[in-house]
Amino acid sequence: MSRFLICSFALVLLYPAGIDMYLVGLPRIAADLNASEAQLHIAFSVYLAGMAAAMLFAGKVADRSGRKPVAIPGAALFIIASVFCSLAETSTLFLAGRFLQGLGAGCCYVVAFAILRDTLDDRRRAKVLSLLNGITCIIPVLAPVLGHLIMLKFPWQSLFWAMAMMGIAVLMLSLFILKETRPAAPAASDKPRENSESLLNRFFLSRVVITTLSVSVILTFVNTSPVLLMEIMGFERGEYATIMALTAGVSMTVSFSTPFALGIFKPRTLMITSQVLFLAAGITLAVSPSHAVSLFGITLICAGFSVGFGVAMSQALGPFSLRAGVASSTLGIAQVCGSSLWIWLAAVVGIGAWNMLIGILIACSIVSLLLIMFVAPGRPVAAHEEIHHHA
């Protein structure tokens, strides 16, 4: 079992590493490519677009051909794209490389969740996804630090060579450690069950909405945090970095505590707790009389996301024993596109950073609480329906 956990964690971590590691080198990249930093900030959106594009096909291919045939090309593409970015001499080529990086990371991301669905029952999967969420929270803190240390002695291109090395590690794991987990093609008697795993299932759709809104909350916070903390609240850059590190610490602590909480409380209780924390955060930020209270509200956001997201993702994947790849892709596409659409629309309409965050917090909590209360899960997957990996 440990081989699947290690491989899944490695496959997922390419995604945040590809986002955060290069940011520290952005000024030098812009100078060398004769582009403004503002022009290169679109590299974040281009990377997410590549991930979304990969998710359109990766899940279906993973369900038909297997997890390894998607993970291996995905890791290889991430390596090639990282090298391509390091060799880019224009901003156009650099952005093209970032898109290809997103394609590779998206393939690996989809496969990771499909593997966890294949190999873990509902309760263990919820615990592992909570742990994975905690580990993912470490990357935005550690990746820029690692990038800074690399750039003390090496040029910015070395950041992408470091990413390529990460991709090589994932490729080696996928080639030599990971075993295929896709279930065998269903027999004729299993066809009705395969057909019953519909993406239009009310319970699955409710979890798609909940996880998409939750991701929208956390990405809105990350996207608006420089404005909120430095421009509105007046913190210096060093203080901003410290606050963000502390919020990551809160996220990690809660994420690593959630598996223990699942041994005491029902998953539904933790999901309700998550949304109540979001609602409390929105109200706190709306009526906050001081910076200290506002910072407390921000910690509630991090705690709320960490306590509920892994559980919601596990519930979303639960009904899909034969179509885990497609379900994982659907979740990823909805989360990436939904959160990006909200941030874009809010910017177009002219909603300020503070109100943007408060609005999504309150909307997420109200909608999600209603869905949790009134959309019950279908029958649990029986033990004989659990998918076992190939020997």
UniProtKB/Swiss-Prot annotation:
It comes from the Bacteria. Keywords: Antibiotic resistance, Cell inner membrane, Cell membrane, Membrane, Transmembrane, Transmembrane helix, Transport. NCBIfam families: PRK10473.1. Its main location: membrane. Residues 1-3, 63-68, 114-130, 179-202, 266-268, 314-330, 377-391 are cytoplasmic. Belongs to the major facilitator superfamily. DHA1 family. MdtL (TC 2.A.1.2.22) subfamily. It comes from Escherichia coli (strain K12). It is found in: Cell inner membrane. One of its GO terms (cellular component) is plasma membrane. InterPro entries: MFS, MFS_dom, MFS_Efflux_Transporters, MFS_trans_sf, Multidrug-R_MdtL. Pfam families: MFS_1 (PF07690). The lineage of its organism: Bacteria, Pseudomonadati, Pseudomonadota, Gammaproteobacteria, Enterobacterales. Residues 25-41, 90-92, 152-157, 223-244, 290-292, 352-355 are periplasmic. It is a multi-pass membrane protein. One of its GO terms (molecular function) is transmembrane transporter activity. The chain crosses the membrane at residues 4-24, 42-62, 69-89, 93-113, 131-151, 158-178, 203-222, 245-265, 269-289, 293-313, 331-351, 356-376. One of its GO terms (biological process) is xenobiotic detoxification by transmembrane export across the plasma membrane. PROSITE patterns: MFS. Confers resistance to chloramphenicol. This is Multidrug resistance protein MdtL. HAMAP family: MFS_MdtL (MF_01530).
